[in-house]
């Protein structure tokens, strides 16, 4: 039996490209501020998952401040991240995401 993955992580650029990550399959920018992330392991059913998402640079670039929200989707391998500027307006932002499973 494969070992249960307890953590997932990624850094996503504003265009939806994956800068780096662990156990991430893909990321798609689906609207001005909405990203759909597909993981290699399910976030639901076999596991309970908690998330931490912060706006942050991909490497060394300056980043405009903002906030991100996370949510599960019907597909247990997928989740949604939405990013906003500090006024609450949808905005593309790079972000760091960590998921903790138990």
Predicted regions and their residues:
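Extracellular attachment/recognition segments
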Residues: 1-102
């Amino acid at each position: 039996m494969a070992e249960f993955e307890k953590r997932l992580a990624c850094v996503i650029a504003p265009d939806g490209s994956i800068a780096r990550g662990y156990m991430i399959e893909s990321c798609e920018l689906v609207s001005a501020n909405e990203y759909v992330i597909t993981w290699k392991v399910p976030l639901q059913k076999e596991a309970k998952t908690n998330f931490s998402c912060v706006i942050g640079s991909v490497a060394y670039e300056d980043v405009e401040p903002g906030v991100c929200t996370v949510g599960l989707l019907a597909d247990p391998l997928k989740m949604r991240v939405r990013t906003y500027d500090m006024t609450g307006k949808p905005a593309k932002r790079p972000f760091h995401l960590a998921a903790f499973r138990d």
